[in-house]
Amino acid sequence: MLLCAQYILPITSDPIVGGAVLVRDGRICDIGKVEMLKLRYPDEESLDYGTAAIMPGLVDLHTHMENSIMRGIVHDVPYTTWLASVASLSTKVEVADWYDSAILGGLDALASGITCVADITATGAACTAAQKLGLRGVIYREVGVMDKRRIDFAMHSAENDIMHWSQEVDTDRITIGIAPAPIYMCHPAVFGKVSELATRDDLPVAMHLAGSRE
């Protein structure tokens, strides 16, 4: 299939005006001027998007798709007030709601041109959403516990989730990782445990390195 448009944005090279992209079996096989590709592949079916731009999908490097239903509920307040409000509202959310919320977040991403996400989740809802919607990305299992006595249990639960999530997703598109929660939600020992697990199982790690001074 030749996908044609007024603009092709390869990103790694200059834009192509009046260009086309050859896609076969879900892979980009060629790119160039429409006329050139139609001569090169005369029997190829084509689809012309007209006055549009074809470009690689955008990447969202930090998202929480399962929290999408919280948008607009609490806003224009100090960070700590917002955080406490979201935490309180979260206790009223059913398991199925988290999955619906993650689907909503994934649809919002796709509508914005985002095709790859780095999502941090404690529920696993983002795994289901990414799998169903065809998103690419890294889904990080969040671990946050303040009580030192509960760290081993929290890590064991996270390890089990990571194993199960890895079996449920298309590993050609989705990678499972681990993420310690922000420092104000974690006992310091959690970071060491996360590092040990990530090193042992070769897991990607996401961390909140900055936040509000509050």
Question: In which residue ranges do the predicted regions lie?
Answer:
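N-terminal metal-binding scaffold of metallo-dependent hydrolase/deaminase domains
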Residues: 1-40, 52
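Divalent metal-coordination and catalytic microenvironments
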Residues: 6, 21, 26, 51, ...
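Short, glycine/acidic-enriched loop or turn micro-motifs at the edges of active sites
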Residues: 33, 63-65, 122, 211
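Divalent metal-binding segments
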Residues: 50, 77-122, 180-190
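Hydrophobic "anchor" residues on beta-strands that sit immediately upstream
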Residues: 58, 115, 204
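Active-site gating loops and adjacent loop-to-helix segments of metal-dependent hydrolytic enzymes
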Residues: 69-100, 138-148, 159, 212-214
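Metal-coordinating catalytic core of metallo-dependent amide/deamination hydrolases
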Residues: 126-214
